[in-house]
Amino acid sequence: MALPLYLVGLSHKTAPLEVRERAALDPVVALPAALSALGKGVVLSTCNRTELYGVGSPEKARAFLLSRGVAPRHLYVKEGVEALRHLYRVAAGLDSLVVGEAQILGQVREALFLARRQGATESLLEKAFQSAIALGKRARSETGIGMGAVSVAYAALDLALAVYGDLSGLSVAVLGAGEMAELFLTHLKAHGVGRILVVNRTEEKAQALAERFGGEAFGLPALPQVLRQADLVVASAAAPHYLVGPEDLPKRAKPLFLIDIALPRNIDPRVGDLPHAYLYNLDDLKRVVDRNLRARAGEIPKVEALIEKALGDYMEWYAGHRVREAIRALEAWARVQAAKAQPEAGPVELEKAAGRLAHPFILGLKRRALDRVGGPPCPEDCLLYRLSRT
Protein backbone atom coordinates (compact mmCIF):
# COMPACT_ATOMS: atom_id res chain seq x y z
CA MET A 1 0.00 0.00 0.00
CA ALA A 2 1.09 3.61 -0.66
CA LEU A 3 2.41 5.84 2.08
CA PRO A 4 -0.85 7.48 3.22
CA LEU A 5 0.55 10.91 4.13
CA TYR A 6 -0.88 14.01 2.48
CA LEU A 7 -0.25 17.74 2.44
CA VAL A 8 -2.57 20.55 1.36
CA GLY A 9 -1.26 24.08 1.50
CA LEU A 10 -0.32 27.42 0.01
CA SER A 11 2.82 29.50 0.31
CA HIS A 12 4.62 32.59 -0.93
CA LYS A 13 5.30 30.61 -4.10
CA THR A 14 1.63 30.05 -4.97
CA ALA A 15 -0.38 32.81 -3.28
CA PRO A 16 -0.04 36.59 -2.87
CA LEU A 17 0.12 38.18 0.56
CA GLU A 18 -3.59 39.01 0.84
CA VAL A 19 -4.51 35.35 0.19
CA ARG A 20 -1.95 34.09 2.72
CA GLU A 21 -3.52 36.43 5.27
CA ARG A 22 -6.92 34.79 4.81
CA ALA A 23 -5.41 31.34 5.27
CA ALA A 24 -3.26 32.19 8.31
CA LEU A 25 -4.37 30.34 11.45
CA ASP A 26 -4.01 31.94 14.85
CA PRO A 27 -3.12 29.39 17.56
CA VAL A 28 -5.99 30.27 19.92
CA VAL A 29 -9.12 29.80 17.78
CA ALA A 30 -8.42 28.89 14.16
CA LEU A 31 -5.68 26.31 14.74
CA PRO A 32 -7.76 24.07 17.06
CA ALA A 33 -10.63 24.38 14.57
CA ALA A 34 -8.37 23.22 11.75
CA LEU A 35 -7.08 20.26 13.75
CA SER A 36 -10.65 19.36 14.70
CA ALA A 37 -11.65 19.41 11.02
CA LEU A 38 -8.71 17.17 10.10
CA GLY A 39 -9.25 14.62 12.86
CA LYS A 40 -5.58 13.68 12.89
CA GLY A 41 -3.11 16.14 11.47
CA VAL A 42 -0.44 18.78 11.93
CA VAL A 43 -0.90 22.42 10.89
CA LEU A 44 2.09 24.56 9.92
CA SER A 45 1.07 28.23 9.74
CA THR A 46 3.77 30.90 9.32
CA CYS A 47 4.10 34.30 7.67
CA ASN A 48 4.83 32.62 4.34
CA ARG A 49 2.78 29.41 4.36
CA THR A 50 -0.23 27.55 5.71
CA GLU A 51 0.06 23.78 5.31
CA LEU A 52 -2.14 20.97 6.62
CA TYR A 53 -0.52 17.54 6.97
CA GLY A 54 -2.52 14.40 7.63
CA VAL A 55 -3.06 10.71 6.95
CA GLY A 56 -5.63 9.35 4.51
CA SER A 57 -7.62 11.51 2.10
CA PRO A 58 -6.70 15.19 1.65
CA GLU A 59 -10.27 16.28 0.84
CA LYS A 60 -11.18 17.58 4.33
CA ALA A 61 -8.00 19.63 4.50
CA ARG A 62 -8.62 21.04 1.03
CA ALA A 63 -12.22 21.92 1.91
CA PHE A 64 -11.07 23.65 5.10
CA LEU A 65 -8.69 25.96 3.24
CA LEU A 66 -11.23 26.66 0.50
CA SER A 67 -13.71 27.65 3.24
CA ARG A 68 -11.31 30.41 4.28
CA GLY A 69 -11.59 32.10 0.90
CA VAL A 70 -8.57 30.49 -0.76
CA ALA A 71 -9.01 29.83 -4.49
CA PRO A 72 -8.14 26.32 -5.76
CA ARG A 73 -5.41 27.77 -8.01
CA HIS A 74 -3.47 28.91 -4.94
CA LEU A 75 -3.41 25.44 -3.33
CA TYR A 76 -1.04 22.55 -3.80
CA VAL A 77 -1.84 18.96 -2.84
CA LYS A 78 0.89 16.37 -2.39
CA GLU A 79 0.50 12.76 -1.32
CA GLY A 80 2.74 9.90 -0.28
CA VAL A 81 6.49 10.33 -0.63
CA GLU A 82 6.04 13.73 -2.31
CA ALA A 83 4.26 15.09 0.78
CA LEU A 84 7.11 13.85 2.95
CA ARG A 85 9.75 15.27 0.60
CA HIS A 86 8.02 18.66 0.75
CA LEU A 87 8.01 18.62 4.56
CA TYR A 88 11.72 17.82 4.56
CA ARG A 89 12.43 20.68 2.15
CA VAL A 90 10.46 23.05 4.37
CA ALA A 91 12.29 21.98 7.54
CA ALA A 92 15.67 22.25 5.79
CA GLY A 93 14.89 25.80 4.69
CA LEU A 94 14.88 25.05 0.94
CA ASP A 95 11.25 26.11 0.48
CA SER A 96 11.53 29.31 2.54
CA LEU A 97 11.33 32.84 1.21
CA VAL A 98 14.83 33.24 2.65
CA VAL A 99 16.53 29.97 1.67
CA GLY A 100 18.34 28.43 4.63
CA GLU A 101 16.60 30.54 7.29
CA ALA A 102 16.55 28.88 10.70
CA GLN A 103 13.25 30.20 12.06
CA ILE A 104 11.19 27.69 10.08
CA LEU A 105 12.72 24.78 12.01
CA GLY A 106 11.36 26.16 15.28
CA GLN A 107 7.99 26.65 13.60
CA VAL A 108 7.92 23.00 12.45
CA ARG A 109 8.74 21.94 16.01
CA GLU A 110 5.99 24.20 17.37
CA ALA A 111 3.47 22.79 14.87
CA LEU A 112 4.15 19.26 16.13
CA PHE A 113 3.90 20.41 19.75
CA LEU A 114 0.51 22.08 19.18
CA ALA A 115 -0.84 19.01 17.36
CA ARG A 116 0.27 16.78 20.22
CA ARG A 117 -1.44 19.08 22.71
CA GLN A 118 -4.68 18.69 20.74
CA GLY A 119 -4.24 14.90 20.59
CA ALA A 120 -4.14 15.18 16.79
CA THR A 121 -1.00 13.20 15.95
CA GLU A 122 -0.48 9.54 15.15
CA SER A 123 2.55 7.38 14.46
CA LEU A 124 3.19 8.23 10.78
CA LEU A 125 2.88 11.98 11.39
CA GLU A 126 4.98 11.82 14.56
CA LYS A 127 7.77 10.02 12.74
CA ALA A 128 7.53 12.35 9.73
CA PHE A 129 7.84 15.51 11.80
CA GLN A 130 10.48 14.14 14.17
CA SER A 131 12.61 13.08 11.21
CA ALA A 132 12.01 16.45 9.51
CA ILE A 133 13.26 18.28 12.60
CA ALA A 134 16.34 16.04 12.78
CA LEU A 135 16.99 16.63 9.07
CA GLY A 136 16.65 20.40 9.49
CA LYS A 137 19.32 20.35 12.19
CA ARG A 138 21.65 18.27 10.02
CA ALA A 139 21.15 20.54 7.01
CA ARG A 140 22.34 23.53 9.00
CA SER A 141 25.17 21.79 10.83
CA GLU A 142 26.58 19.74 7.92
CA THR A 143 26.16 22.21 5.04
CA GLY A 144 26.50 25.94 4.57
CA ILE A 145 22.82 26.47 3.69
CA GLY A 146 22.39 28.71 6.73
CA MET A 147 25.70 30.52 6.50
CA GLY A 148 25.58 34.16 7.46
CA ALA A 149 22.47 35.78 8.86
CA VAL A 150 19.50 34.37 6.98
CA SER A 151 15.97 35.26 8.08
CA VAL A 152 13.07 37.45 7.07
CA ALA A 153 14.22 39.83 9.80
CA TYR A 154 17.69 40.03 8.25
CA ALA A 155 16.19 40.60 4.81
CA ALA A 156 14.26 43.53 6.33
CA LEU A 157 17.51 44.94 7.69
CA ASP A 158 19.17 44.43 4.30
CA LEU A 159 16.40 46.48 2.73
CA ALA A 160 16.84 49.22 5.35
CA LEU A 161 20.57 49.31 4.65
CA ALA A 162 19.89 49.57 0.91
CA VAL A 163 17.61 52.56 1.54
CA TYR A 164 19.67 54.42 4.14
CA GLY A 165 23.20 53.05 3.95
CA ASP A 166 24.17 54.40 7.38
CA LEU A 167 21.69 53.70 10.21
CA SER A 168 23.61 55.48 12.96
CA GLY A 169 21.55 58.68 12.88
CA LEU A 170 18.14 57.05 12.58
CA SER A 171 15.26 56.50 14.97
CA VAL A 172 13.90 53.00 14.31
CA ALA A 173 10.50 51.92 15.67
CA VAL A 174 9.76 48.22 16.04
CA LEU A 175 6.14 47.09 16.44
CA GLY A 176 5.89 43.85 18.39
CA ALA A 177 8.08 42.13 20.96
CA GLY A 178 8.13 38.56 19.67
CA GLU A 179 10.77 36.39 18.02
CA MET A 180 10.81 38.32 14.73
CA ALA A 181 11.23 41.66 16.52
CA GLU A 182 14.04 40.21 18.63
CA LEU A 183 15.82 38.86 15.54
CA PHE A 184 15.55 42.19 13.76
CA LEU A 185 16.87 44.11 16.77
CA THR A 186 19.79 41.67 17.09
CA HIS A 187 20.83 42.39 13.50
CA LEU A 188 20.07 46.10 13.87
CA LYS A 189 22.24 46.47 16.95
CA ALA A 190 25.16 44.83 15.17
CA HIS A 191 24.99 47.51 12.47
CA GLY A 192 24.61 50.41 14.87
CA VAL A 193 21.52 52.61 15.10
CA GLY A 194 20.80 55.99 16.63
CA ARG A 195 17.62 55.23 18.60
CA ILE A 196 15.41 52.18 19.13
CA LEU A 197 11.70 52.54 19.96
CA VAL A 198 9.83 49.32 20.87
CA VAL A 199 6.03 49.37 20.79
CA ASN A 200 3.91 46.46 22.01
CA ARG A 201 0.38 45.82 23.19
CA THR A 202 1.85 44.60 26.49
CA GLU A 203 4.17 47.36 27.64
CA GLU A 204 6.03 45.02 30.03
CA LYS A 205 7.16 42.89 27.07
CA ALA A 206 8.22 46.01 25.21
CA GLN A 207 10.20 47.09 28.26
CA ALA A 208 12.00 43.74 28.54
CA LEU A 209 13.00 43.80 24.87
CA ALA A 210 13.99 47.47 24.91
CA GLU A 211 16.24 46.94 27.93
CA ARG A 212 18.12 44.17 26.10
CA PHE A 213 18.94 46.42 23.16
CA GLY A 214 19.27 49.82 24.82
CA GLY A 215 15.95 51.09 23.49
CA GLU A 216 12.84 52.84 24.77
CA ALA A 217 9.56 51.02 25.46
CA PHE A 218 6.01 52.14 24.69
CA GLY A 219 2.54 50.67 24.95
CA LEU A 220 0.23 50.59 21.92
CA PRO A 221 -1.61 53.81 22.90
CA ALA A 222 1.67 55.70 22.36
CA LEU A 223 2.02 54.45 18.76
CA PRO A 224 0.98 57.77 17.09
CA GLN A 225 3.63 59.60 19.15
CA VAL A 226 6.28 57.01 18.19
CA LEU A 227 5.41 57.24 14.49
CA ARG A 228 6.01 60.98 14.55
CA GLN A 229 9.53 60.40 15.90
CA ALA A 230 10.55 57.47 13.67
CA ASP A 231 12.54 57.46 10.44
CA LEU A 232 12.03 53.73 9.88
CA VAL A 233 9.23 51.45 11.13
CA VAL A 234 9.52 47.66 11.16
CA ALA A 235 6.22 45.95 11.99
CA SER A 236 6.12 42.36 13.27
CA ALA A 237 3.31 42.34 15.86
CA ALA A 238 0.79 39.51 16.19
CA ALA A 239 -2.45 41.42 15.62
CA PRO A 240 -5.71 40.44 13.88
CA HIS A 241 -6.13 43.91 12.32
CA TYR A 242 -4.10 46.84 11.02
CA LEU A 243 -2.21 48.82 13.66
CA VAL A 244 -1.16 51.64 11.33
CA GLY A 245 -3.40 53.35 8.79
CA PRO A 246 -3.14 56.46 6.61
CA GLU A 247 -4.86 58.51 9.31
CA ASP A 248 -1.99 57.72 11.69
CA LEU A 249 0.60 59.35 9.43
CA PRO A 250 -0.04 63.07 8.97
CA LYS A 251 2.06 64.89 6.40
CA ARG A 252 5.65 65.32 7.48
CA ALA A 253 8.76 67.05 6.17
CA LYS A 254 10.96 63.96 5.92
CA PRO A 255 9.91 60.63 4.39
CA LEU A 256 9.00 57.62 6.51
CA PHE A 257 10.01 54.12 5.45
CA LEU A 258 7.90 51.22 6.74
CA ILE A 259 8.67 47.50 6.43
CA ASP A 260 5.79 45.19 7.33
CA ILE A 261 6.98 41.62 8.01
CA ALA A 262 3.86 40.58 9.96
CA LEU A 263 1.13 38.20 8.81
CA PRO A 264 -1.62 39.27 9.05
CA ARG A 265 -0.17 42.62 8.06
CA ASN A 266 0.19 45.36 10.67
CA ILE A 267 0.15 48.26 8.21
CA ASP A 268 -2.78 49.16 5.96
CA PRO A 269 -1.52 48.92 2.35
CA ARG A 270 -3.12 52.34 1.65
CA VAL A 271 -0.24 53.82 3.65
CA GLY A 272 1.91 53.17 0.59
CA ASP A 273 -0.20 55.68 -1.36
CA LEU A 274 0.85 58.57 0.90
CA PRO A 275 3.41 60.87 -0.77
CA HIS A 276 5.64 60.92 2.31
CA ALA A 277 5.50 57.18 3.14
CA TYR A 278 7.31 54.26 1.49
CA LEU A 279 5.85 50.87 2.42
CA TYR A 280 7.42 47.45 1.84
CA ASN A 281 5.90 44.07 2.72
CA LEU A 282 6.90 40.40 2.73
CA ASP A 283 6.48 40.04 -1.02
CA ASP A 284 8.74 43.05 -1.61
CA LEU A 285 11.51 41.34 0.36
CA LYS A 286 11.81 38.68 -2.33
CA ARG A 287 14.11 40.88 -4.43
CA VAL A 288 16.47 41.24 -1.47
CA VAL A 289 16.27 37.51 -0.83
CA ASP A 290 17.08 36.59 -4.44
CA ARG A 291 20.33 38.52 -4.16
CA ASN A 292 21.27 36.76 -0.92
CA LEU A 293 20.40 33.34 -2.34
CA ARG A 294 23.28 33.37 -4.80
CA ALA A 295 25.77 33.02 -1.93
CA ARG A 296 24.12 29.78 -0.77
CA ALA A 297 23.05 28.25 -4.07
CA GLY A 298 26.01 25.85 -4.11
CA GLU A 299 24.86 24.30 -0.83
CA ILE A 300 21.42 23.31 -2.10
CA PRO A 301 22.52 20.01 -3.76
CA LYS A 302 24.16 18.96 -0.48
CA VAL A 303 20.91 19.54 1.40
CA GLU A 304 18.94 17.71 -1.29
CA ALA A 305 21.23 14.70 -0.85
CA LEU A 306 20.48 14.72 2.90
CA ILE A 307 16.78 14.88 2.08
CA GLU A 308 16.95 11.83 -0.19
CA LYS A 309 18.84 9.91 2.50
CA ALA A 310 16.22 10.89 5.10
CA LEU A 311 13.44 9.78 2.74
CA GLY A 312 15.10 6.39 2.36
CA ASP A 313 15.45 6.06 6.13
CA TYR A 314 11.78 6.94 6.65
CA MET A 315 10.59 4.48 4.03
CA GLU A 316 12.71 1.75 5.59
CA TRP A 317 11.11 2.57 8.94
CA TYR A 318 7.68 2.57 7.29
CA ALA A 319 8.33 -0.86 5.78
CA GLY A 320 8.92 -2.18 9.28
CA HIS A 321 5.94 -0.23 10.62
CA ARG A 322 3.59 -1.82 8.10
CA VAL A 323 4.48 -5.33 9.18
CA ARG A 324 5.18 -4.78 12.88
CA GLU A 325 2.46 -7.22 13.94
CA ALA A 326 3.87 -9.89 11.66
CA ILE A 327 7.36 -9.22 13.02
CA ARG A 328 6.13 -9.58 16.59
CA ALA A 329 4.43 -12.82 15.66
CA LEU A 330 7.60 -14.09 13.94
CA GLU A 331 9.63 -13.27 17.04
CA ALA A 332 7.15 -15.16 19.24
CA TRP A 333 7.20 -18.10 16.84
CA ALA A 334 11.03 -18.10 16.86
CA ARG A 335 11.09 -18.21 20.67
CA VAL A 336 8.79 -21.24 20.65
CA GLN A 337 10.91 -23.01 18.03
CA ALA A 338 14.14 -22.23 19.91
CA ALA A 339 12.67 -23.61 23.14
CA LYS A 340 11.64 -26.81 21.36
CA ALA A 341 15.09 -27.24 19.81
CA GLN A 342 17.04 -26.43 23.01
CA PRO A 343 14.88 -27.41 26.00
CA GLU A 344 17.87 -27.25 28.38
CA ALA A 345 19.05 -23.76 27.34
CA GLY A 346 18.76 -20.77 29.65
CA PRO A 347 16.83 -17.54 28.85
CA VAL A 348 19.81 -15.67 27.39
CA GLU A 349 20.80 -18.53 25.09
CA LEU A 350 17.18 -19.03 24.00
CA GLU A 351 16.77 -15.32 23.19
CA LYS A 352 19.94 -15.36 21.07
CA ALA A 353 18.84 -18.53 19.26
CA ALA A 354 15.38 -17.06 18.61
CA GLY A 355 16.98 -13.89 17.24
CA ARG A 356 19.19 -15.87 14.86
CA LEU A 357 16.19 -17.86 13.66
CA ALA A 358 13.87 -14.88 13.16
CA HIS A 359 16.39 -12.41 11.72
CA PRO A 360 16.48 -13.54 8.05
CA PHE A 361 12.68 -13.84 7.96
CA ILE A 362 12.25 -10.33 9.39
CA LEU A 363 14.72 -8.85 6.89
CA GLY A 364 12.90 -10.54 4.03
CA LEU A 365 9.55 -9.34 5.34
CA LYS A 366 10.78 -5.73 5.54
CA ARG A 367 12.40 -5.92 2.11
CA ARG A 368 9.26 -7.22 0.45
CA ALA A 369 7.17 -4.58 2.21
CA LEU A 370 9.59 -1.85 1.08
CA ASP A 371 9.47 -3.12 -2.49
CA ARG A 372 5.69 -2.85 -2.40
CA VAL A 373 5.52 0.73 -1.00
CA GLY A 374 3.37 2.55 -3.50
CA GLY A 375 1.94 -0.74 -4.76
CA PRO A 376 -0.55 -3.40 -3.62
CA PRO A 377 -0.17 -5.35 -0.37
CA CYS A 378 2.45 -8.08 -0.59
CA PRO A 379 0.92 -11.60 -0.59
CA GLU A 380 4.13 -13.04 0.83
CA ASP A 381 3.76 -10.75 3.85
CA CYS A 382 0.29 -12.12 4.48
CA LEU A 383 1.54 -15.70 4.03
CA LEU A 384 4.44 -15.21 6.42
CA TYR A 385 2.10 -13.63 8.90
CA ARG A 386 -0.23 -16.61 8.77
CA LEU A 387 2.67 -19.05 9.06
CA SER A 388 4.03 -17.19 12.05
CA ARG A 389 0.72 -17.71 13.86
CA THR A 390 0.95 -21.48 13.61
Curated annotation (Swiss-Prot):
Judging by the UniProt lineage, the source's domain of life is: Bacteria
Could you list this entry's UniProt keywords, alphabetically sorted: NADP, Oxidoreductase, Porphyrin biosynthesis
CDD domains of this UniProt entry?
A: NAD_bind_Glutamyl_tRNA_reduct (cd05213)
Q: Where does NADP(+) bind?
A: G176, A177, G178, E179, M180, A181
Q: Where does substrate bind?
A: T46, C47, N48, R49, S96, E101, A102, Q103, Q107
Important for activity, annotated site positions: H86
State which pathway it belongs to.
Porphyrin-containing compound metabolism; protoporphyrin-IX biosynthesis; 5-aminolevulinate from L-glutamyl-tRNA(Glu): step 1/2
Molecular function terms from GO: glutamyl-tRNA reductase activity; NADP binding
As recorded in UniProt, its EC number(s) are 1.2.1.70
Reaction(s) the record says it catalyses: (S)-4-amino-5-oxopentanoate + tRNA(Glu) + NADP(+) = L-glutamyl-tRNA(Glu) + NADPH + H(+)
| Residues of the active site | C47 (nucleophile)
> Quick one: a GO biological-process term for this protein?
protoporphyrinogen IX biosynthetic process from glutamate
Instruction: Print the domain comment field.
Output: Possesses an unusual extended V-shaped dimeric structure with each monomer consisting of three distinct domains arranged along a curved 'spinal' alpha-helix. The N-terminal catalytic domain specifically recognizes the glutamate moiety of the substrate. The second domain is the NADPH-binding domain, and the third C-terminal domain is responsible for dimerization.
Q: Assembly and partners? A: Homodimer.
Give the family per the record: Belongs to the glutamyl-tRNA reductase family.
Quote the function comment for this protein.
Catalyzes the NADPH-dependent reduction of glutamyl-tRNA(Glu) to glutamate 1-semialdehyde (GSA).
- Other remarks in the entry: During catalysis, the active site Cys acts as a nucleophile attacking the alpha-carbonyl group of tRNA-bound glutamate with the formation of a thioester intermediate between enzyme and glutamate, and the concomitant release of tRNA(Glu). The thioester intermediate is finally reduced by direct hydride transfer from NADPH, to form the product GSA.
**Protein name per Swiss-Prot or TrEMBL:** Glutamyl-tRNA reductase
